[in-house]
Amino acid sequence: GIGLSANQVGLPFRMFVIGGHPQIEDGKIRNCFNPLIKDFSQETVNMKEGCLSFPFLFLMINRPKWVNVEYTDENGEKIEEYLHGMTARIFQHENEHMNGYVFTDLVSKLKLDRGKKAQAKLIKQTIRRQQERLRNEVASKNVKI
C-alpha cells in the first residue's frame, strides 16, 4: 500500500500515513494528523485506484489534479503543502477514509459491479498462479504429497 488511515486498522485518530513508495513523487513519508484539504484544482485526472480495504478491487476514480493541504506532522509542526500527481491522489483517498467514505462510494453501481467482476477474476487468477508455483516448488524438491 501507498497509504493507510488510522481508522482502517481500528485506531480512533484523525491520522494517516502516505509515502515510502516509488509512486510517490518525492519519496517522502508523511504522517498526517488532523489533515485538511484547503483548496483543490478544478482540473481532474481519471485514474485506476485500489485500496487495502478492498483487496484486488481497482476502480477508475476522478480526482482533482492538485490539492493545497494542511496537517500536523509527527513532531507537532503545522505543515501546509501543495501536492500534485500521485501524492495528491493518495492524500485525498486517505482523507476520505477519515471522513467516512471509501473509493467505492465514488463510482456508479454499474462501475462497481464491473469492478467486482474483475476483482473475482483477478483473485481466481492469483490463486491459480500460487497453486502452480507451489506445485512446481514441491516437484523440484521431489516431495510427495
Mark where each language-model region is:
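Positively charged
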Residues: 1-145
